């Protein structure tokens, strides 16, 4: 592309162009480095296309394999309707997905385009299940219409999910939503040992709110849904004990326990799914992002109802069922994740990175607090929104590091699973300098 191609100007005539001021060079960008076509500058990518790129950009096992690129082109030449007409490419993807990411207790799968529609279909699964479960018990089949969810949750921007998302009024204001029961998230402030009493009290309040919702809406709660770690809402961690207690409440009250792993899934926390580290046994799991397409896995109590959505034709469906080209790409990415043992690598790299991030934070006590992480899903807080936004700008414009905000005052890290400690060290040095520029009295950067 020539430098006078005016990509942003041409786009701005028709769409809102308020993203990064970078024109992505699809040829020179690679791994954890993004190159701007217009300036030639390289940026350290610690956002990975909103946590959707498991191996970074242009992974060699994809772009460096002519045979695979020909296969990908073959799959992309047409866009068949996967739910209706089948291909070996589709079957190959499902086999690899089940092997690398599957849970034997969740054998049912459904694929769709995007995370919001993944959650949407998880909710439809729960509504259908609760209605039929009520009917089996002699209760009203018209009930089973409500979802318990958390404050600061982000589950998407589609029809049902708008009633759950509550991170930023810009995303939900003026759109009609359901008044479903919303309970306070008992988010951990780290270090946990210094805040345990407050966190336990918050958990007790939240559980009391959930119990009240079940009492006030008998037979009408279809499910509880949560992100194992709230992402956009502030990288909010919850203790396993709280989520396990919510799981017990769901079982005691005949509601499904649903997890939204759209951002936490596919290794970011050090296991295929975050719930595997938290002692949880979900009935439905929604996924997207790093999978390259959206979908749900389901099982456990879903099968207590024989005619659930996975048994009755067309109860849930979509035209393309996820997209064949995305499935072919996903299969190769998952094969590399498996071959290279990236889940274990993320565990070790993430533990090292969190320790280093805590060390940086300790040098800026007036600016940095609540350093937290699981695997490579790490974050920290600034005193307020203004400081957070200023730091993000300094990192991008002066240090050439791409990071994301979350919540009202947090910075979150979303690197590729393949990022090296050397690249993370580059990011930490840049962060140290940026914090020093932002102005912490008495703090001296170590690098």
Locate each region found by the language model.
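Conserved N-terminal phosphate-binding loop of PLP-dependent enzymes in the Aspartate aminotransferase
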Residues: 1-447
């Amino acid at each position: 592309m020539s430098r006078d191609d005016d990509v942003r100007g041409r786009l701005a005539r028709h769409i809102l162009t308020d993203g990064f001021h970078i024109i992505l060079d699809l040829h020179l960008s690679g791994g954890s480095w993004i190159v701007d076509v217009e300036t030639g500058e390289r940026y350290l990518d610690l956002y990975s296309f909103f946590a959707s790129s498991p191996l970074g950009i242009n992974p060699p096992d994809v772009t460096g394999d002519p045979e695979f690129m020909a296969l990908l082109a073959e799959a992309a030449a047409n866009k068949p309707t996967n739910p209706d007409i089948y291909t070996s490419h589709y079957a190959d993807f499902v086999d690899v997905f089940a092997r690398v990411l599957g849970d034997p207790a969740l054998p049912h799968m459904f694929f769709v385009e995007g995370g919001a529609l993944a959650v949407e279909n998880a909710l439809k699964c729960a509504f259908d299940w609760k209605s039929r479960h009520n009917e089996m018990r002699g209760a009203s089949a018209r009930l089973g219409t409500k979802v318990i969810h958390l404050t600061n949750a982000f589950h998407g921007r589609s029809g049902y999910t708008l009633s759950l998302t509550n991170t930023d009024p810009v995303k939900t204001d003026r759109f009609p939503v359901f008044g479903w029961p919303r309970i306070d998230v008992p988010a951990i402030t780290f270090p946990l040992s210094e805040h345990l009493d407050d966190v336990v009290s918050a958990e007790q309040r939240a559980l009391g709110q959930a119990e009240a919702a079940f009492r006030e809406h008998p037979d009408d709660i279809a499910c509880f849904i949560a992100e194992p770690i709230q992402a956009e809402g502030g990288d909010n961690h919850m203790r396993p004990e709280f989520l396990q207690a919510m799981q017990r409440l769901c079982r005691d009250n005949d509601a499904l326990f649903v997890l939204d792993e759209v951002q936490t899934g596919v290794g970011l926390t050090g296991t295929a799914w975050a719930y595997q580290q938290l002692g949880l046994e979900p009935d439905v799991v929604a996924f997207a992002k790093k999978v390259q397409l959206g979908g749900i896995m389901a099982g456990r109590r879903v099968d207590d109802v024989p005619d659930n959505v996975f048994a009755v034709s067309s109860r849930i469906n979509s035209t393309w069922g996820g997209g064949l080209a995305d499935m072919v790409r996903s299969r190769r990415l998952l094969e590399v994740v498996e071959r290279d043992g990236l889940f274990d690598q993320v565990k070790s790299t993430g533990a090292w990175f969190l320790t280093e991030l805590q060390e940086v934070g300790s040098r800026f006590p007036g600016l940095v607090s609540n350093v937290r992480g699981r695997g490579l899903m790490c974050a920290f807080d600034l005193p307020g929104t203004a400081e957070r936004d200023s730091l993000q700008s300094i990192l991008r414009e002066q240090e050439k590091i791409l990071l994301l905000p979350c919540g009202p005052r947090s910075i979150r890290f979303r690197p590729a699973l393949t990022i090296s400690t050397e690249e993370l060290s580059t990011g930490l040095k840049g962060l140290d300098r940026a914090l020093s520029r932002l102005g912490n009295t008495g703090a001296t950067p170590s690098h």
